[in-house]
From Swiss-Prot:
GO terms for molecular function: chitin binding; chitinase activity; endochitinase activity. This is Endochitinase WIN8. Residues 1-23 form the signal peptide. It catalyses: Random endo-hydrolysis of N-acetyl-beta-D-glucosaminide (1->4)-beta-linkages in chitin and chitodextrins. It comes from Populus trichocarpa. Defense against chitin-containing fungal pathogens. Residues 24-64 form the Chitin-binding type-1 domain. Disulfide bonds join 26-41, 35-47, 40-54, 58-62, 84-146, 158-168, 266-298. Its EC number is 3.2.1.14.
Length: 316
């Protein structure tokens, strides 16, 4: 897994630099040297890319550690419930390392904008991985990140319109925090991340860092339907066109639900799932002490043109 690869990288750097594991690699202990490959330098003078290196005490090439492990645990207290199929898979360190690939995530705009994006991302992913039907009804909206693989998929998610570009050689059911689905999504995401996910989609369900990276790929990038990225919407970087305004599409959390579900939860049939997303979001906004903003619902929004590129399906 890539998380362990980072640890190996740190050890290899020690060998290449001709130092022992007890010899400082960076900082004042090493002549104010910085770490290669943009790694963080810890207070002890060692290079790495986890919280221990990049947050408290970090001396150079540090990361934004506003969203702490404690917050992660408070948001997702039941993810390691014994009944959860994904028990032990999702960790704060894996999330933290994955965000390195997307420096704009949670780092765009003022503090409230950053908080709002974090709340929105974890709300949408909590609904996608909800273990409500497994754990039970206690402690409302604490069921997120219980699932890694889609429960009882009713399709192999091979889109005939894109199979010439992205041949279907496996099953492309939902995996990871945003339950990545469809052959084209695995193909495009794999190309972006330098991974052969079309042949090996199971990597999204076996490598925690890659799993978060795949979710963030969908979140951070605009889509071929003409839909903006979720990141652009929630940070205020997207402004609706005249066509968007006529279609009822407005900036806000509801627009994210429209994008992620391709409008599937903006109808009467999807009302319960849409409300779940909103309730997760309100809980997380309260935890982060930020106003959720306007336009939480997508009821009156038209979907973007369906050319087979956005077909994310929510869970109960």
């Amino acid at each position: 897994m890539r998380f362990w690869a980072l640890t190996v990288l740190s050890l290899l750097l020690s060998l290449l630099l001709g130092v022992s594991s007890d010899t400082a690699q960076c900082g004042s202990q090493a002549g104010n040297a910085t770490c290669p490959n943009d790694l963080c330098c810890s207070s002890g003078g060692y290079c790495g890319l986890t919280v221990a290196y990049c947050c408290a005490g970090c001396v150079s090439q540090c990361r934004n550690c506003f969203f702490t492990e404690s917050m992660f645990e408070q948001m997702l207290p039941n993810r390691n419930n014994d009944s959860c199929p994904g028990k032990g898979f999702y960790t704060y360190d894996a999330y933290f390392v994955a965000t390195e690939f997307y420096p704009g995530f949670g780092m765009t705009g003022d503090d409230d904008t950053r908080k709002r994006e974090l709340a929105a991302f974890f709300a949408q992913t909590s609904q996608e991985t909800s273990g409500r039907s497994i754990i039970g009804e206690d402690a409302p909206f604490t069921w997120g990140y219980c699932l890694v693989n889609e429960l009882n998929p009713n399709s192999d998610y091979c889109d005939p319109k894109t199979k010439s570009s992205y041949p279907c050689v496996a099953d492309y059911y939902g995996r990871g925090p945003l339950q990545l689905r469809w052959n084209y999504n695995y193909g495009e995401c794999g190309n972006y991340l330098g991974q052969n996910l079309l042949d090996e989609p199971e990597k999204v369900a076996t490598d925690p860092v890659l799993s978060f990276e795949a979710a963030l790929w969908f979140w951070m990038n605009p889509h071929s339907t003409g839909a903006p990225s979720c990141h652009e919407v929630i940070t205020g970087e997207w402004s609706p066109s005249e066509a968007d305004i006529e279609a009822g599409r407005k900036p806000g959390f509801g627009m994210l639900t429209n994008i992620i579900t391709n409008g599937g939860e903006c109808t009467k049939d999807g009302k319960t799932r849409q409300q779940n997303r909103i309730d997760y979001y309100l809980r997380y906004c309260d935890m982060l002490q930020v106003d959720p903003g306007d336009n939480l619902y997508c009821d009156n929004q038209e979907t973007f043109e369906d050319n087979g590129l956005l077909k994310m399906v929510g869970t109960m």
